[in-house]
UniProtKB/Swiss-Prot annotation:
One of its GO terms (molecular function) is sulfate adenylyltransferase (ATP) activity. Heterodimer composed of CysD, the smaller subunit, and CysN. The gene is cysD. GO terms for biological process: hydrogen sulfide biosynthetic process; sulfate assimilation. NCBIfam families: CysD (TIGR02039), PRK05253.1 (NF003587), PRK12563.1 (NF009214). It comes from Rhodopseudomonas palustris (strain BisB18). The keyword rRNA-binding does not apply. This is Sulfate adenylyltransferase subunit 2. Belongs to the PAPS reductase family. CysD subfamily. Residues 305-328 are annotated as: Disordered. It is an enzyme of class 2 (transferase).
Amino acid sequence: MTDILDELDAGRAPLAPTLADLRGDWARAEPSAHLQRLESESIHILREVAAEFAKPVMLYSIGKDSSVLLHLAMKAFAPGKPPFPLLHVDTTWKFREMIEFRDQRMRELGLDLIVHINPDGVAQGIGPFSHGSALHTDVMKTQGLRQALEAHGFDAAIGGARRDEEKSRAKERIFSHRSAAHRWDPKNQRPELWSLYNTLLAPGESMRVFPLSNWTERDVWDYILVEQIPIVPLYFAALRPVVERDGALIMVDDARMPLRPGEVPQLRSVRFRTLGCYPLTGAMPSTATTLEQIVDEMLASRSSERQGRVIDRDSTGSMERKKAEGYF
């Protein structure tokens, strides 16, 4: 395994497209009226959060939705910077390219980024291989997020979740109320009429806000193309070392991944439709190296955007249950 990782690192540039390569291929186009309406709604929501809450924060998970959300936030408050910090809950198992991209974007934009790692999880050595996906996700993501929100006293957390991603998210409000214990009750949601939002909170309560609620996966990709938004190169097809495990193509991103008997990493042309912790995120065979090709693949697909997320397969890990416990 070490040999193939060393080989990949040594020749990484020609295998995976760089941000400069990708930007050079993107032709700027005018946004459609549909995208303009979505953009206007999202910017209105972001400004509403800044006006109504004492200490908001924006979750930055480095994926395509977070990249669109960050771009919208920069637009909403231009020529100034967003009046709230960004927060990344780092599980320590993200793809290396994701962390490199995160740090590069923060340097380019000069933004305030808070990176939180659950110290209890680190002390216990919690990881997806040693403890399983369910416990890893709960400790390093859900509990880590709650720790960060409480430590900094944030009363509103902005995220990039969309209603078309998953059925429990489809029924969640744009302004989603959370109890003092960060719990979401799907049976106790507030009405949202037109663009009027109830932002009132009792002491200790908080709000999760989703400005991209009404966007679809296609909308996100169209907007990325039109606005030339930088995204992690992992979304584009390239030769990457993968093993087939439990029906998923798992990328061997570093030497921490233990190989099972008979497993040998193979370089295959793959990309990722969604991003998370690398041991829990399956790749898809692909030759799509442009945004147009990605959209074509997506339109031809009959599978869920989150099909590669191993955490969604846990019998006790439904999205609604995780959200009720404080997951974003």
